[in-house]
């Protein structure tokens, strides 16, 4: 890898980029976006450095050109056999999804199951075991001897079989969360399969400091409601139907001593208003001339729990919300915001102090090019909110990838985590084929990029879904889950934006486990 201003050409370079496109940045002042009845100014146009080395990178699958600044690529591990289609590398049935970490292990989720890698030497990850278990998305979390995995597709089977389910109604179908016993990491065993009406697009492990015998799993379902003939009690009715499977999440209680007894213990109506209307938040549609059309709030895409502050951030289609999780079985909404620049609220990340939260907008669903020159700087971006002493959120600024991407690169804000640099708020983030971007939001009104890595598109002729699903910091290194290419490992390097001492302080923070949706509170040892 070479530093900013230079590119690297892949050894097999099959395709060459032809068109320079433009990108984004900036935290505009005066855009007060959280009030639903407010008509904001027009979204600002994109701004970028025309000399940015990410512009014009050559295309390819494993041989694309790349550009890097403030980081060093230590390892690039292709997806193993059984987790990609050699004839169609972008085959979505084998996409890499989210990551989880425990000690010297990395768990890589995939639409076709999951893999466990030994990362005791981060520069040389080695595959320990693969578990084939189709059903998508395959997002994973780890806690002690348990791995939890989301399943939402109708092809998912209770027995993890690869043959799928042909019948429209079947007792063999699995849509919900799977729990695997990994006390023997070389022989993961499914011990529970908790069915839910909409399946599990994502899930969140929630812990209770006062309860060491159980963990809780919040199920976020975004797919269609399955028939009641397949799972009794499932209804796809509107908010007037008290039994509807919409407008809720599910809470699963998992006894650590007997995880096979895991069960749904609550289905809280976290969008209800004071009158009990289940559809109490954003009703869907645009916010006025020149604004986004935001989805109806009847689901959460992601919930990030931060037990250290007793809150969770919910990215819930048409709203961003805060939940009081002091009682994990009964989360209650304490704040909500909407934003006329957001199409679909996707994920949330708190700063370490818990007084700022970053929400992402997955405009285009993650499969569309949304980082082009013609795309507004506040659409498909991060919105950064201060959390006041009263617990309410106030918009501070926006951040979007500050570089243009092409028409054949799916690109929008996606998953990331905090890098624990003392005294600063820094987030590493995936932008699909926009690559990796490190955002400094210590001043929430003026966020800016401090490091990046990007590859050229998979193709300059056609748009194939690829790029980074997630990028997370774990014990001194950054790990990126690349949808179509595999796993990348980075270390930070000193730059004008980040000193060697700051990097060393971040690298000194060691934790046993990391799930991005269960955010830990970091404390640094006295220097």
Regions found by a protein language model. Give the residues of each.
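Secretory targeting and sorting signals
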Residues: 3-31
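Short intrinsically disordered, low-complexity coil segments enriched in acidic
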Residues: 1-3, 118
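Feature marking well-ordered beta-strand scaffolds used for ligand recognition
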Residues: 34-527
């Amino acid at each position: 890898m070479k530093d900013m201003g230079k590119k690297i050409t892949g050894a097999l370079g099959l395709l060459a980029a032809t068109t320079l496109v433009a990108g984004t940045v900036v935290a505009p002042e005066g855009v007060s976006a959280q009030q639903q009845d407010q008509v904001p100014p027009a979204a600002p146009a994109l701004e970028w450095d025309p000399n940015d080395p990410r512009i014009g990178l050559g295309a390819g699958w494993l041989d694309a050109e790349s550009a890097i600044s403030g980081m060093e690529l230590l390892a690039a591990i292709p997806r193993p056999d059984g987790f990609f289609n050699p004839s169609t590398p972008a085959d979505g049935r084998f996409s890499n999804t989210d990551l989880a970490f425990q000690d010297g292990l990395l768990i890589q989720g995939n639409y076709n199951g999951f893999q466990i890698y030994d990362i005791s030497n981060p520069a040389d990850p080695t595959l320990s075991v693969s578990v084939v278990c189709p059903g998508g998305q395959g997002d994973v979390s780890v806690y002690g001897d348990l791995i939890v995995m989301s399943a939402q597709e109708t092809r998912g089977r209770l027995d993890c079989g690869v043959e799928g389910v042909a019948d429209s109604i079947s007792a063999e179908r699995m849509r919900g969360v799977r729990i695997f016993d990994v006390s023997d990491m070389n022989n993961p065993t499914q011990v529970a399969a908790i069915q839910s009406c909409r399946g599990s697009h994502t899930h969140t492990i929630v812990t209770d400091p006062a309860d060491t015998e159980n963990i809780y799993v919040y199920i976020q379902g975004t797919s269609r409601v399955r028939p009641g003939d397949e799972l009794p009690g499932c209804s796809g009715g509107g908010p007037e139907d008290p039994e509807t499977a919409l407008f809720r999440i599910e809470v699963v209680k998992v006894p650590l001593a007997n995880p096979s007894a895991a069960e749904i213990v609550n289905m809280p109506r976290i969008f209800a208003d004071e009158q009990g209307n289940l559809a109490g938040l954003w009703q869907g549609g645009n916010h006025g001339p020149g604004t986004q059309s935001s989805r109806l709030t009847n689901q959460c895409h992601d919930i990030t729990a931060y037990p250290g502050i007793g809150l969770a951030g919910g990215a819930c289609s048409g709203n961003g919300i805060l939940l009081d999780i002091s009682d994990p079985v009964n989360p209650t909404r304490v704040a909500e915001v909407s934003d006329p620049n957001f199409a679909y609220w996707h994920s949330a990340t708190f700063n370490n102090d818990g007084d700022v939260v970053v929400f992402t907008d997955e405009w285009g669903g993650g499969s569309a090019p949304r980082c082009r020159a013609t795309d507004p700087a506040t659409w498909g971006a991060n919105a950064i909110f201060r959390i006041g002493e009263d617990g309410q959120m106030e918009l501070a600024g926006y951040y979007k990838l500050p570089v243009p991407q092409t028409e054949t690169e799916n690109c929008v804000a996606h998953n990331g985590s905090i890098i624990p640099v003392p005294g600063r708020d820094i987030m590493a983030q995936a932008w699909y084929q926009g690559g990796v971007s490190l955002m400094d939001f210590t001043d929430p009104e003026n966020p800016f990029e401090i490091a990046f890595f990007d590859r050229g598109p998979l193709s300059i002729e056609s748009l194939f879904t690829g790029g980074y699903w997630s990028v997370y910091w774990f014990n001194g290194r950054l790990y990126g889950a690349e949808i179509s290419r595999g796993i990348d490992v980075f270390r930070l390097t000193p730059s004008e934006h980040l000193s060697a001492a700051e990097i060393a302080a971040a690298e000194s923070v060691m934790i046993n486990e990391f799930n991005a949706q269960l955010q830990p509170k970091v404390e640094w040892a006295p220097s």
